[in-house]
């Protein structure tokens, strides 16, 4: 048998022919769709050179002749890439696979059929570093791009995002925890370093008060004893700074009555407060309830408040004990009264009475069961009515005169020195005469004053929310309790049932006159402020602005022209800053009654 000899080239061609015949049933014709318009910019024209720049600065020419390129599979079914049968397998062996003793630097990848995307655009804007060349010798793959093109797994990115979100939320919760502990100095409104001499104060005001009570404190104000004390101007006037220290409640003892007893008593009180919060606040509202200052947390539910179980005698005793102390004015009888001097005396006296009024309100039974916002709002609405009923009560024994303080007794003629004051004087004198005719008793007076406080803003700030409805119901229950106490006093005095009803109606009708006088007084005080007759104190000024915002004339109408947007933002929706600061830190029972 004769064996035909073949050269190496003819032998390889024969081998390729045999393999092509065996694989011919598997081949399918390539479907070619004619293009209706020219290729876009993202497609490659094989007739043009293609050079692509990578971020690392290396340029790759994909139309250059590739030496020893690895073939790849096409995407159309099981067929190999288009081209001649011999070229479909490349030049390196069967099916284009690398020999076992060689390692290809390029991976075997699956690519799109022609027309091919020039380099394939990833949705995230990254370019895939594999590219198919259309050469006469067959399809080949260029080497993969630099390792810098490696794209992280999407799951890893999501996990990293979740970790960043978790760390951000942890930082946010830590920031909120630290914000809840932020306290401000009651004197200058700087950051407080601790609880010193009975109030939260900074190191500077603490040291100043310590030096003042230990050494000489005969400070003299170079102005009118009305200097503003804040963070930037606290060192400008020592006299006014010391006066403000006393006004906010600083005392020589340095320990409040409810803080005596040492560390064990402090821990016991904290445990009691925690138990009270758990009873009063639902679990879902615990986080929001902790934002309020601890002395004002509600410790009892409204329906189970111990105030509602008080007897009439216990209610009277509590109201009498809550009465504020007597305050003296700065009146100098040797100096004649003028418009500026009289308004200065009255505003100074009112400003100091406001601080004592805050302490009195907190001792009214049932008042502390309300939220902080509602307590401050009631005070903002009723403060001038409360001052006026106290003035009328003190003036009952002085017909034709008004007793503003034990050392300040004014008649109608003296009120003429202030423009517009005579009308208010006449109304106050008429109400005092009415009290005198009715022979108003001290127990009835304290009940009427408490009714003014609780009834002043109950219909102006409560919304239809469940919490507001609960507050409204609680206020009405306390008002009913005080009304029952009034009836008990009348019955105890020996009045018949008909006389009790008549006297109760007469007393309650007088309260409407106090509301009318209060509105007149607010208008007059506001006019004096606009005329710059007298500089108002910070607390009195904020109370005046808050009352104007709560007044019915401003509901739905434009705000006062002289108020800035920041004042509207703070006063309209939240309690006044100065009043809230006095409310939380002020201890009026320790204030001096004279200056």
UniProtKB/Swiss-Prot annotation:
Residues 257-269 have a biased composition (Basic residues). Belongs to the nuclear hormone receptor family. NR3 subfamily. One of its GO terms (biological process) is antral ovarian follicle growth. The modification Phosphotyrosine is found at residue 537. Residues 35-47 are annotated as: Required for interaction with NCOA1. Residues 185-310 are annotated as: Mediates interaction with DNTTIP2. Residues 144-174, 257-288, 551-575 are annotated as: Disordered. The modification Phosphoserine is found at residues 104, 106, 118, 167. A zinc finger (NR C4-type) spans 185-205, 221-245. The gene is ESR1. Residues 311-547 form the NR LBD domain. Its main location: nucleus. The modification Asymmetric dimethylarginine is found at residue 260. Glycans are attached at residue 10. Residues 264-594 are annotated as: Self-association. Composed of three domains: a modulating N-terminal domain, a DNA-binding domain and a C-terminal ligand-binding domain. The modulating domain, also known as A/B or AF-1 domain has a ligand-independent transactivation function. The C-terminus contains a ligand-dependent transactivation domain, also known as E/F or AF-2 domain which overlaps with the ligand binding domain. AF-1 and AF-2 activate transcription independently and synergistically and act in a promoter- and cell-specific manner. Residues 185-250 bind DNA. PROSITE patterns: NR_LBD (PS51843), NUCLEAR_REC_DBD_1 (PS00031), NUCLEAR_REC_DBD_2 (PS51030). A lipid is attached at residue 447 (S-palmitoyl cysteine). Residues 1-184 are annotated as: Modulating (transactivation AF-1). This is Estrogen receptor. The keyword Oxidoreductase does not apply.
